Curated annotation (Swiss-Prot):
This is tRNA (guanine-N(1)-)-methyltransferase. The keyword S-adenosyl-L-methionine applies. It comes from Nitrosococcus oceani (strain ATCC 19707 / BCRC 17464 / JCM 30415 / NCIMB 11848 / C-107). Specifically methylates guanosine-37 in various tRNAs. GO terms for molecular function: tRNA (guanine(37)-N1)-methyltransferase activity. It catalyses: guanosine(37) in tRNA + S-adenosyl-L-methionine = N(1)-methylguanosine(37) in tRNA + S-adenosyl-L-homocysteine + H(+).
Length: 252
């Protein structure tokens, strides 16, 4: 998968090359990542990329010409079918389903805005989709681009150490992930749940599903409201709720 980023600060992405899932995907050649700085496309000697907004108001707005020229070069280099994504609070909110939809593209070009944003006409003329990573404001779109690139890299075959890791992540099946444990078996009185030591794979699968359902019920009930649970899931969730309420019932 090919990625490109239009950014004033390409150095922010250096950490992606050196570590984690994205670094592994880059080294394996599963993804490519290129950058275009709008300042390199400015026509004046000061390499100006912003100007005061029409109508007044605080801050500066990124102008069309340097961004548009950078997008044209990026599109050409990333190849046919490249989609241009502008990262902004007004965009579609990112979730796992959104990542899976974006993963169907061969190449994506992210436009990372700064200041008060970009001239609206650039969005109308050049942008295919707007995306947001949440209802809050960042200093620019670079961190949002990194979030999306990381999420997409995880979905590519062969990138994660274990093939099933991505399928067990939170949100993949519309639920939060179950708890995980490793050595030691006991620490300061806190024990690993016995079922995980039993070797009974059917019981382990059932426990993990129950915990995922219960954790979602406790922490993100909105996710459950969007799902239709099958009979097993209904029984496991009811069992979790009974156990939880019994454990947390206040003494009379």
């Amino acid at each position: 998968m090919r990625f490109g980023v239009i950014t004033l600060f390409p150095g922010m992405f250096d950490a992606l090359w050196d570590s984690g899932v994205v670094g592994r995907a880059l080294k394996q050649g599963k993804i490519s990542l290129n950058f275009w700085n709008p300042r390199d496309f400015a026509h004046d000697r000061h390499r100006t990329v912003d100007a005061r907004p029409y109508g007044g108001g605080p801050g500066m707005v990124m102008g069309i010409q340097p961004l548009r020229d950078a997008i044209h070069v990026g599109r050409a280099e990333l190849g046919k079918g490249c989609r241009v994504l502008y990262l902004s609070p007004q965009g579609r909110r990112l979730d796992q389903a959104g990542l899976e939809a974006l993963a169907s593209n061969e190449s994506l070009l992210f436009v990372a805005g700064r200041y008060e944003g970009v001239d609206e006409r650039l969005i109308e003329m050049e942008v295919d989709e707007e995306w947001s990573i949440g209802d809050y404001v960042l200093s620019g779109g670079e961190l949002a681009a990194m979030v999306i690139i990381d999420g997409l890299a995880r979905l590519l075959p062969g990138v994660l150490g274990a093939a099933e890791s991505a399928q067990q992540d939170s949100f993949v099946n519309g639920l939060l992930d179950c708890p995980h444990y490793t050595r030691p078996e006991v620490i300061e009185g806190y024990r690993v749940p016995p079922v995980l030591l039993s070797g009974d794979h059917k019981a382990i699968r059932r426990w993990r599903l129950k915990q995922a359902l219960g954790r979602t019920w406790l922490k993100r009930p909105d996710l459950l409201s969007r799902r239709i649970l099958d009979l097993e899931q209904q029984h496991l969730l009811a069992e979790f709720i009974r156990e939880y309420q019994a454990e947390h019932r206040e003494p009379r």
